[in-house]
Amino acid sequence: MQLSDIFLRLGEETFQQLMHSVSMGRLRTYQLFDRMKARLHLHKLNSETLRKASPRLWARLGEHDDEFATDLAQAILVSHLDMIKAVLDHLGVPHQDGFFAKDTDVSNYLKDGWQSEVWEKFRAAFPPAALLFYINHLAWEVAKAEDVFAPAA
């Protein structure tokens, strides 16, 4: 499974919510603002232009451009570092402000059922779309998941 598959399987509505949650301040803090502006082909990057560009960005994800998906994921994840830190702390995963140390194997911290457990614990505290994306991103990145986690309705 590729990163673009996570976006596509979560659906366009979830993608729209994720785009609305991107923090311009965090993009600037982590020096991603100019890179994102260029990758998204936007002359001006702000919440409104990002929202308006979402249908076009969704179409680009459908082309399975994994570099593009990686850049989008990075923008989304840095916008939700408080959530990431809370989830990693809950799972007991060692991290530095939400980031893993280089060459660290954290897969042994992800026990059976961790996705449902994290969803139930944090879904009321954080935006559901961002939490669902992070759960799937973590599973893909660390556990090499081949399927997308979707909580029971």
Please tell me what each predicted stretch does.
Residues 1, 149-153:
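Short intrinsically disordered terminal tails
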Residues 1-34:
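Short terminal alpha-helical segments
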Residues 24-143:
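Acidic, low-complexity, intrinsically disordered interaction modules
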